[in-house]
UniProtKB/Swiss-Prot annotation:
Positions annotated to bind substrate: 45, 66, 258
Classification of source organism: Bacteria, Pseudomonadati, Pseudomonadota, Gammaproteobacteria, Enterobacterales
Gene name as annotated: pdxB
Subunit structure: Homodimer.
Subcellular location: Cytoplasm
Organism of provenance: Pectobacterium carotovorum subsp. carotovorum (strain PC1)
Protein name stated in the entry: Erythronate-4-phosphate dehydrogenase
Annotated family: Belongs to the D-isomer specific 2-hydroxyacid dehydrogenase family. PdxB subfamily.
Cellular compartments per GO CC: cytosol
Length: 378
């Protein structure tokens, strides 16, 4: 069997070669002639999978090593007998840690304590619920908005978006992109929402670019709207607005989910789905793939506070690096995708073992996603 894999899917060649002949291919653009004779196609979010790409091909399985699936026309795939599997939740921890790192950076810069803020989370799926749990572990008040879950009667105190816009100091978006329908999220944050969002607040988009009307956001900032803005996703990509980038506080190249662990989870999830599809199910232990991190262990001699948490977080990942990289090259054609293709290895907080002086600090760090223990009790 011939299996095409995105050249930027870590461990893909290593894993899929167990089950067939593997060819690494570019994700954007993906030339149609490379599909000749292929039985399966493994992609990331940069590849639009639809009739234009696959009609007339022999592909019978598509795997997307991503949490989101708006780049895949799964209706067309189903109608044409092509199986599809994605990797829901694979990069959720990475996105949560991106948001947390960004907020701690703003807190240090602007002189506030994150625990004193109220965070409104829009979209309480794989990312949103994990972010909610970690913020609460740090003592941060959260407000949740998720109309589909509210209408289904899911457990949770869900509020209208208008309430979050009114009451939250920080609004962070973690929804799928729905272009229409009762739960439309395209331009969910538009000019009217921006007008209602008070000055001095923080807006974060790390889900899909068009969830925020980028033109309306740029216009609001140009008119003097006093918002701190964190954007990892843009409208459109990869041709983002450099004028908007110049006005946001943190801007990155759609890399919030790009931890080594998150990428590896995505690859292993679609590999396991493919192995089941062909009748040879296999399970992969993530730990068997990952290398030793650059920083594996650190010892604390004092109790944990927000300044110390920020230092631990930024020891593993400092979002300012990615912000600086995008600003340096954003005006150059093709550099947005190049940054993503050649992204520097980034680990999750769990890769760092923190030896604490007290049990309360260790308990808190474990709840936040680190690997922590008390000195002498390891």
């Amino acid at each position: 069997m011939k299996i095409l894999v995105d050249e930027n899917m870590p461990y893909a060649r290593e894993l899929f070669s167990r089950l067939g002949d593997v060819q690494a291919v570019p994700g954007r653009p993906l030339p149609r002639d490379l599909l000749a004779g292929a039985d399966a196609l493994m992609v990331r979010s940069v590849t639009k999978v639809n009739a234009d790409l696959l009609s007339g091909s022999a592909v019978k399985f598509v795997g997307s090593a991503t949490a989101g699936t708006d780049h895949v026309d799964d209706t067309w795939l189903n109608a044409n007998g092509i199986a599809f599997s994605a990797a829901p939740g694979c990069n959720a921890i990475a996105v949560v840690e991106y948001v947390f790192s960004s907020l701690l950076m703003l807190a240090e810069r602007d002189g506030f304590q994150l625990r004193d803020k109220t965070v409104g989370i829009v979209g309480v799926g794989n990312v949103g619920r994990r972010l909610d749990a970690r913020l609460k572990a740090w003592g941060v008040k959260t407000l949740l908005c998720d109309p589909p879950r509210a209408d289904r009667g899911d457990a949770g105190d869900f509020l209208p978006l208008e309430t979050l816009v009114r009451d939250a100091d920080i609004l962070t978006l973690h929804t799928p992109l729905y272009l229409d329908g009762p739960y439309r999220t395209h331009h969910l944050v538009d000019a009217s929402v921006l007008d209602a969002f008070a000055d001095g607040r923080i807006l974060i988009n790390a889900c899909r670019g068009p969830v925020v009307d980028n033109a309306a956001l740029l216009e609001a900032l140009q008119r003097g709207k006093k918002l701190s803005v964190i954007l990892d996703v843009w409208e459109p990509e990869p041709e983002l607005s450099t004028d908007l980038l110049a006005r946001v506080d943190i801007g990155t190249a759609h890399i919030a989910g790009y931890t080594l662990e998150g990428k590896a989870r995505g690859t292993t999830q679609v590999f396991e789905a493919w192995s089941e599809f062909i009748g040879t199910p296999q399970q992969v232990a993530l730990s068997s793939l990952l290398p030793e991190p650059e920083y594996a262990e650190v010892t604390l001699t004092v109790p944990l506070d927000e300044a110390l948490l920020k230092r631990l977080v930024h020891l593993v990942y400092d979002v300012r690096r990615d912000d600086a990289l995008l600003r340096h090259v954003a005006h150059q054609e093709g550099e947005f995708d190049r940054l993503r293709k050649h992204y520097q290895e980034r680990r999750e907080w769990s890769s760092l073992h923190v030896i604490c002086a007290d049990a309360d600090s260790a308990d808190c760090l474990n709840a936040l996603g680190f690997t922590a223990s008390v000195r002498g009790a390891r």
